Amino acid sequence: MNPALPEDVKNLLTDLETFILDVLKGETLSKKAKEKKEVLIKRLKDIKHSYPQDFQDKAETDDQEENDGFSLPPDAVSIASDRDKDEELPYDGSFYPSVAAQDLDYLRAGYLEKRRKDHSFFASEWQKRWCVLTNSMFYYYGSDKDKQQKGAFSLDGYRAKMNDTLRKDAKKDCCFEILAPDKRVYQFAASSPKEAEEWINVIMNARGNIPSEDEELYDDVNQEMDASHEEDIYEELPEESEKPVTGSETPKATPVPVNNTSGKENTDYANFYRGLWDCNGDHPDELSFKYGDTIYILSKEYNTYGWWVGEMKGTIGLVPKAYIIEMYDI
């Protein structure tokens, strides 16, 4: 029997095998390169046969590590060995049950490149994944036909933003990340900057549109109050009274006097919110605020677009509702 191979040599051979069989699989190779590839594959097989004691348990061990606690059904399209090696338990320690990609009721779905948390020298850093976004969850699969996800996480507490520092190639401006304080960061690359922005918008609206019991109660009880409140605002502007603001127009924040809330801000605790994250307005009619800032909500007219009208320190503007949270538990 041949002596055992050193551990670093075994790791090198494993990385080389991954590079040849996985990384080069989708590449267009010349005839000479294909011949060289076949020679290397044959030599790797010969080495395995010469050192069976070093490779006999490899397949079983890999399956156990890569399954990451999920059981794979017999008819699954995904192969266990193709499972992301960088997957980990969800942040809250819970398991999400297996669900087929085609069984999900989704807000958006499509192929993205997902960045692996850890990758070896030969392994690909970015992997093509079929991503599915529901009202509260983000799933990713090897393909849209998979019977079980490669990973999933709850959107609770997460937000999404562009990040042009993740890559240096042509997709530099197509990258975005989904992140939250003290949680794992998930990074993706779309096919275009526009597609990346669309994913971000859907993610932010999805995580912001998860209604709590208090929010549902508030919407029912205070619907009449909101309508009368808006009438008070526009009665002070006679030149605007004949042309009320519609859902397709941007409300003009600066002409509205600060004292036109008729004293409601002193007792209307349900309309007091605080900043959940820092927010810098991209346009003059958007309100800029920081984490913890107090904001009084004047109107929820643009709720379907993910925006409210708020007032802070005498300034009135549009506020992304996903960036604020109720100040009082009423």
UniProtKB/Swiss-Prot annotation:
Keyword Phosphoprotein applies: yes
PTM info: Phosphorylated on tyrosines.
Protein name: Src kinase-associated phosphoprotein 2-A
Subcellular localization, as worded in the UniProt entry: Cytoplasm
Coiled-coil regions listed: none
Residue ranges occupied by any SH3 domain in the UniProt entry: 268-329
Family according to the record: Belongs to the SKAP family.
GO cellular component: cytoplasm; plasma membrane
Primary location class: cytoplasm
Source organism (scientific name): Xenopus laevis (African clawed frog)
Lineage, highest ranks first: Eukaryota, Metazoa, Chordata, Craniata, Vertebrata
PROSITE patterns (UniProt xref): PH_DOMAIN, SH3
Keyword Protease (UniProt): no
Region Disordered, annotated ranges: 53-77, 228-261
PH domain span: 105-208
PANTHER family: SRC KINASE-ASSOCIATED PHOSPHOPROTEIN 2 (PTHR15129:SF2), SRC-ASSOCIATED ADAPTOR PROTEIN (PTHR15129)
Composition-biased stretches (Polar residues): 247-261
